[in-house]
UniProtKB/Swiss-Prot annotation:
The lineage of its organism: Bacteria, Bacillati, Actinomycetota, Actinomycetes, Frankiales. ATP binds at H15, D173, G174, K175, R246, F247, D255, R261, K262, A278, K282. Pfam families: S-AdoMet_synt_C, S-AdoMet_synt_M, S-AdoMet_synt_N. Its cofactor is Mg(2+); K(+). It comes from Frankia casuarinae (strain DSM 45818 / CECT 9043 / HFP020203 / CcI3). Pathway: Amino-acid biosynthesis; S-adenosyl-L-methionine biosynthesis; S-adenosyl-L-methionine from L-methionine: step 1/1. Homotetramer; dimer of dimers. This is S-adenosylmethionine synthase 1. GO terms for molecular function: ATP binding; magnesium ion binding; methionine adenosyltransferase activity. The keyword Metal-binding applies. One of its GO terms (biological process) is S-adenosylmethionine biosynthetic process.
Length: 401
């Protein structure tokens, strides 16, 4: 089979764009905690000395936006030593109400307004038009592509050794990148790891940072991979640490951060398609978020059911309409039953109307802050209901297996 290289990247919680995502989702959680029916669309911009929060919110909850912003920044580790102090940074808030034109389509769907439908799950329309994708593959236990899985693990480890004090000279910002060699569609060899680690002054790259990153960040994760018996060759991989030579200036004083600029990191690392809609700061009435979560759930169950080794699904919505306007299933030749049968089974087992997604995945909860770094998919945390494989048996039954 043909051999090829594929690369995915991740970033730490202290990366400027991820700061923006985490602030937006912390605010979403705060509104949902006070009012589970809150409609929230919040964007965050960070730059030197300033945080600007803007968007639309309709909620009965009262939220101290500035306090949430400061707490998020300081919890991540932004203090005076980093040059961007969460306790003193300027916070500007520009939040209005959701447009009534949008609200009327969400509150009373096309099916109810025009067709007179009485099904309670048909009462809520999609919060916008758009296309969403979900993907799963059997190449890792998490049913996520290996490059993004390892990139996330390394980024999370980079933050952990900082928080735990193992590498106290590290600062919050950072990036990881992993290149894997594939033989056909199977990962076989680790080719390259890139780590960019934000650090204090007077840290020598060659004698301190590179050995520490290799021993404290990468080695534990390679050991974890070995324990998962993936058969990945890791000897002789290329390691690049801070290839510019220094990374003392980081966070929002090095680069501005903005909500929604890491959508490929948030999903499948470029291995699967993306509809273009960001997740963070959006309540689940926005199908950009809820339908993407639902399709990850569907794809994961298709693979767990043994109907295909790889599955990618697309769904499309019209604003204000409950029923999707389209569903597409792709299995890349790995299916064990005909693709039309898989598509029929998916439609039979899963209800992809917005209200049904919200009900089935229990999305009206303040759970979103933990999604905003290290990937929305691939982590089997208790609140990540879209990572369950609880409908694999139903899918098998639907195709007669």
């Amino acid at each position: 089979m043909s051999r090829r290289l594929f690369t995915s990247e991740s970033v730490t919680e202290g990366h400027p764009d991820k700061l923006a995502d985490q602030i937006s989702d912390a605010l979403l959680d705060a509104f949902l905690a006070g009012d589970p029916t809150s409609r929230v669309a919040v964007e965050t911009l960070l730059t030197t000395g300033h945080v600007h929060v803007a968007g639309e919110v309709t909620s009965s909850a009262h939220v101290d936006v500035t306090a949430v912003v400061r707490r998020t920044l300081t919890d991540i580790g932004y203090d005076a030593a980093t040059g961007f102090d969460g306790a003193t940074v300027g916070v500007l808030v520009s939040i209005g109400a959701q447009s009534p034109d949008i609200a009327q389509g969400v509150d009373k769907a096309y099916e109810a307004r025009v067709e007179g439908g009485e099904d309670t799950l048909a009462q809520q329309g999609a919060g916008d038009q758009g296309i969403m994708f979900g993907y799963a593959t059997d190449e890792t236990p998490d049913l996520l592509p290996l490059p993004i899985t390892l990139a996330h693990r390394l980024a999370q480890r980079l933050s952990k050794v900082r928080h735990d004090g193992l590498l106290p000279y590290l600062r919050p910002d950072g990036k990881t990148q992993v290149t894997i060699e594939y033989d056909g569609d199977r990962p076989v060899r680790l080719d390259t790891v890139v780590v960019s680690a934000h650090h204090a002054a007077d840290v020598d790259l060659a004698t301190r940072l590179v050995p520490d990153i290799r021993d404290q960040v990468i080695a534990p994760e390679l050991k974890r991979l070995a324990e998962e018996n993936l058969g990945l060759e890791v000897d002789g991989y290329r390691l690049l640490v801070n290839p510019t030579g220094r990374f003392e200036i980081g966070g929002p004083i090095g680069d501005a951060g903005l909500t929604g600029r890491k959508i490929i990191i948030d999903t499948y690392g470029g291995y699967a398609r993306h509809g273009g809609g960001a997740f963070s700061g959006k309540d689940p009435s926005k199908v950009d978020r809820s339908a993407a979560y639902a399709l990850r759930w569907v794809a994961k169950n298709v693979v767990a059911a043994g109907l295909a080794r790889r599955a990618e699904l697309q769904v499309a919505y019209a604003i204000g309409k409950a029923e999707p306007v389209g569903l597409f299933v792709e299995t890349f030749g790995t299916e064990t039953v005909p693709v039309p049968e898989i598509a029929r089974a998916v439609s039979e087992v899963f209800d992809l109307r917005p209200a049904a997604i919200i009900r089935d995945l229990d999305l009206l909860r303040p759970i979103y802050g933990q999604t905003a770094s290290y990937g929305h998919f691939g982590r089997t945390l208790p609140d990540f209901t879209w990572e369950r494989t609880d409908r694999a048996d139903a899918l098998r039954a639907a195709v007669g297996r």
